[in-house]
Structure formats: structure tokens, C-alpha cells
Amino acid sequence: MERESFQSRLGFLLVSAGCAIGIGNVWRFPYVVGQSGGGLFVLLYLIFLITMGLPVLTMELAVGRASKKSAVLGYKALEKRGSYWHLHGYVAILGCYMLMMYYTTVAGWMVSYFFKFVTGTFETGMDTESCSLEFFHMLSNPKEMGLWMFVVVIAGFIVCSRSLQNGLERISKVMMSSLLVLIIVLAIHSLTLSGAAEGLQFYLIPNLSNIQNIGIGKVIVSAMNQAFFTLSLGVAAMEIFGSYMGREHTLASEGLRICALDTFVAITSGLIIFPACFSFGVEVNAGPSLIFVTLPNVFVNMPAAYRLHNPVFPRFRDNKPS
């Protein structure tokens, strides 16, 4: 059976970048920045991304393209006789399963929030305390979280079952394009909020006083971890995408494009979150709850978004008890 390939180079780039872009950029990056002192962490993160993340990403793509096989079989095809590099393939697969245990859970939180927004749970004028209570109410309801996690898993199975071109590539083009437009619009809006200047100063200007209680060593390790985490390195994901690459483009150029797109989304996410934190009084070191408290504030206090929301979902709004 002939191995399926991507329909276009853009499809490969968006699917590969989509693997890297996601919860690690939109959810994890802002809260780790907040817990790690802001600007200095961002600077170290970019340094590690260029000096360590990009080279490892390129090497993983190289393993995939050279073998044209999945993780374990790829190592077996390339390793010298008597060596045991294929064992890393099994470790990578185990890592993927462990990663999905909480990736699907957090993705479920996000889907839950989407439906709460369109059904009117989040209303214009809600304050930070109300948004925080909504998040912790969700955490106290395991059945709700389990339901949305199940929805995410089933959706993933459906997409993957429709083959590479008709499933993963097609939906990645739509979702990635939508994500890029959305985060740019939200970033522009956040930059117009009162308090945006203080948020940008915390986010983009290194300040040693911000890390006095954290420790420079912890900030360095966190930045290094994020550089590897954000590119999905070490779990054979990029090796699998590399196995679908042709030889008409260089590994370094494709790796650079993936890394650049991933970094753009991460940095832009910070431009959304931190100005909003200082505007709405959200603690920047709030941890995993950061975007689930900040983004509802951004959306419900964004008149244009609210006007779009009402006509699209009038039935939900009308059925909401007063």
C-alpha cells in the first residue's frame, strides 16, 4: 500500500506547527512566564529555543524523513546492528500516552469554556472574582471534566480516521488559520486596555527583582523545559511528521518555519494575557488557572465580540433564566 503524503507544503507546515502549537503555547506558556518572573524568562526561553530546541527539532525531522516510518520502526531501520536506539521509540510512545492524559483534560476545559461562552454563562460585566469562581466550580465537578475530555478524545479519533489529507491536513488548515486570526485580534484588543503598559513591561522587559523569590536557577530550568515542551520534542511527534516530508525542501528551513510559527503564537498569547492581567487585576502568578480567568474577562468586556455572540446564539441567550 502506497504511503499517503501531504497535499501541499502548507499542509505539512500547518500540521507540524499545529502539533507544536496548542496547549503548550496558549495555556502553559503564559502561566509559566507569570510564575517565572516575566521578561527574563522570555529572553532565556528564546535563547534555548534557538540554541537547543531548533537543532533537536531538525534532527527529529531528519530521523523521520530518512526512515519514512513510525517512531519504533524508524529507529530500527536506521540504527546499526546490535544497537538499541529503537528503545527510545517505545519511551517516546509511552511519553505520548502520558502527555495525552492531561492534554485531553485541559483541552476539555477549553471546549467547556467555549460552550459556556456561547450559552451565556459568561456575561458582559463579569468581574475577575466571578470568572475565578466559574473555573474552580468546573474543577470541583469531575463528571463535567470527564465528559468534555471524552468529547475531545472522540473528536481526535474522528479526525485521524479520515486519513491524512482529508482529516488532519484539512482541519489543521482551518483551525490554524482561525487561531492565528483570533489571537491577533485579541492581542490588538488587549494592547488597548488600561494597564496594558504595565503588563508589557512585566512580560517583555527583563527585571532581576521579579525573580528574587524564585531563583535564577529555577527560571533557567523552566525556560529550558518550555523550549522543549513547546516544540513537542522527545515524544517522536516530529519524527512522524518528518516521515511524510519530501526531499525538495531542506530540514533546516522546515524546522525554522515550524519554530517561528510556534514562537509567534506563544509570544502573541503573552501579549493577550499580561496586559489583561494588569487591566482586570488578575495575579500573573496564578498558575494553570491564568488563562481561564483572564480570557473570559477579555471576551466579556469586548463589545465587538459580544455583539457577534448574541446574533449567532440567540436561542441560548433567550432560554437563560433572568
Could you describe each region identified by the protein language model?
Residues 1-27, 56-61, 65-87, 246-250:
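Membrane-interface "cap" regions at the ends of multi-pass membrane proteins
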Residues 2-6, 169, 173-322:
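Membrane-embedded translocation segments of transport machinery
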Residues 3-4, 32-36, 66-91, 104-165, ...:
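Inter-helical loop and helix-membrane interface segments of multi-pass membrane transporters/permeases
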Residues 45-54, 93-118, 148-162, 177-190, ...:
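Hydrophobic core segments of alpha-helical transmembrane domains in multi-pass membrane transport
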Residues 24, 44, 49-61, 71-72, ...:
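Central hydrophobic cores of alpha-helical transmembrane segments in multi-pass inner-membrane proteins
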Residues 11-48, 198, 236-242, 253-256, ...:
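Transmembrane helix-boundary motif of multi-pass solute transporters/channels
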